[in-house]
């Protein structure tokens, strides 16, 4: 049902998925990297935008989250080089409310939330 330019959120265990999601998918026993890889096997990223991937910025709250490196590797392996956008936390929540769906995971890494913009299936 998702169309071109619809977005899907993959949230970590701290993400308020139930209160934000229009459509909620629960994958509590899985981490975000595993789910990200599975989603990208089935859903292409949008090639008509500069940054089809968005992350919740940690605003200097500690070091750059190590999980982001995994995301870059997974995206590159599935889609090639893509730009990532960093979003302020509340702006991320606002955008997530408009997403087609939210996948809630059991991910324990902090600032591990990610938004993917769907491309054209060929």
Where are these regions (language model features)?
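Long, hydrophobic N-terminal alpha-helical segment
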Residues: 1-28
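Structural motif
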Residues: 6-9, 23-25, 47-55, 82-85, ...
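Gly/Ser/Thr-rich active-site loops/lids in small-molecule metabolic enzymes
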Residues: 24-39
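Glycine-rich loops and low-complexity Gly/Arg-rich segments
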Residues: 32-36, 49-52, 80, 108-110
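Ordered, amphipathic secondary-structure segments that act as subunit-interaction surfaces
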Residues: 45-71
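Glycine-rich, aromatic-bearing surface loops/beta-hairpins
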Residues: 62-122
């Amino acid at each position: 049902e998702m169309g071109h330019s619809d977005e899907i959120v993959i949230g970590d265990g701290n993400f308020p998925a139930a209160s934000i999601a229009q459509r909620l998918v629960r994958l509590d026993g899985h981490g975000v990297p595993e789910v990200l890889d599975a989603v990208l096997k089935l859903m292409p990223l949008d090639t008509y935008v500069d940054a089809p991937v968005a992350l919740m910025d940690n605003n200097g709250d500690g070091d750059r989250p190590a999980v982001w490196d995994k995301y870059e590797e997974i995206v590159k392996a599935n889609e090639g080089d893509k730009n990532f956008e960093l979003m302020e936390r509340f702006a991320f929540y606002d955008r997530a409310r408009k997403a087609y769906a939210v996948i809630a995971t059991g991910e324990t890494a902090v600032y591990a939330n990610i938004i993917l913009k769907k491309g054209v299936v060929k």
